């Protein structure tokens, strides 16, 4: 039996401000740092350890991973950073407030942009300063690999090659992996592992900072998955993610 641990980055500054973040490289809040430390505490209490770590090229995920490593005295572990684990690219919505967009366009439209499987948000234009071509961390990508926006379907298509070519072979070689990534790149992995339909994944919300542990058989079929820590707390944090775009609600601190 293999184990795989997934963790979404701790609260970021734009999570706090309730903005669409996507590939924008924002940092953790003090609460986000605390969430990462608490995630490390839960991992230690469960007796889990790792052989290597994987994350995106965005600092909120990288710093979450680094905090967890430091708390576990595992800063020496190899870390693989890859753009395929980045958050879903929210196109022209990046930087905009979710609640304000709900008030302007309606909650239903914003829900479709956030949670539908195959409907992308409005795209960036090629000359937009937010385009990945203006960021040297993506200098090795082809024009086709640089998104102007992404649906969840597009995000799944981006993430799965990293699963098949990197993560799955490492797990089957007996490596114990910790993956620190983002809400939608992790939704893509969970959808694949659990065989979820597009309708099922629409209702899936990944809470910040809580380690999700998979037990996998020799074919990497899940035998069990569960968040570490209190189940009710995990459900409450997942519900908070779902509430972010509602016009009549306020984002949690």
From Swiss-Prot:
Pfam families: His_Phos_1. Its EC number is 5.4.2.11. The active site is at 9 (tele-phosphohistidine intermediate), 87 (proton donor/acceptor). SUPFAM superfamilies: Phosphoglycerate mutase-like (SSF53254). It catalyses: (2R)-2-phosphoglycerate = (2R)-3-phosphoglycerate. Belongs to the phosphoglycerate mutase family. BPG-dependent PGAM subfamily. This is 2,3-bisphosphoglycerate-dependent phosphoglycerate mutase. It comes from Oleidesulfovibrio alaskensis (strain ATCC BAA-1058 / DSM 17464 / G20). The lineage of its organism: Bacteria, Pseudomonadati, Thermodesulfobacteriota, Desulfovibrionia, Desulfovibrionales.
């Amino acid at each position: 039996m293999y184990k795989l641990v997934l963790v979404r980055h701790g609260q970021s500054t734009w999570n706090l401000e309730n903005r669409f973040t996507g590939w924008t490289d924002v940092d953790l809040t003090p609460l986000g740092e605390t969430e990462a430390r608490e995630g490390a505490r839960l991992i230690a209490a469960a007796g889990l350890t790792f052989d290597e770590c994987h994350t995106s090229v965005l600092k909120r995920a990288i710093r979450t991973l680094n905090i967890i490593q430091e708390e576990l005295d595992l800063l020496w572990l190899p870390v693989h950073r890859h753009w395929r684990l980045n958050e879903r690219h929210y196109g022209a919505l990046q930087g905009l407030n979710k609640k304000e967009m709900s008030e302007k366009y309606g909650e239903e439209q914003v829900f479709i942009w956030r949670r539908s499987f195959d409907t992308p948000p409005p795209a960036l234009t090629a000359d937009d300063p937010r385009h990945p071509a203006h960021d040297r961390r993506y200098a090795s990508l082809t024009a086709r690999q640089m998104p102007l926006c992404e649906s969840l379907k597009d995000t799944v298509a981006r993430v799965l090659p990293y699963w098949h070519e990197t993560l799955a072979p490492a797990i089957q070689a007996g490596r114990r992996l910790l993956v620190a990534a983002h809400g939608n790149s992790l939704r893509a992995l969970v959808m694949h592992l659990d065989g979820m339909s597009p309708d099922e994944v629409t209702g899936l919300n990944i809470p910040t900072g809580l380690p999700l542990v998979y037990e996998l058989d020799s074919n990497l079929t899940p035998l069990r998955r569960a968040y570490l820590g209190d189940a009710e707390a995990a459900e409450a944090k997942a519900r908070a993610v779902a509430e972010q775009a509602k016009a009549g609600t306020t984002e949690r601190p």
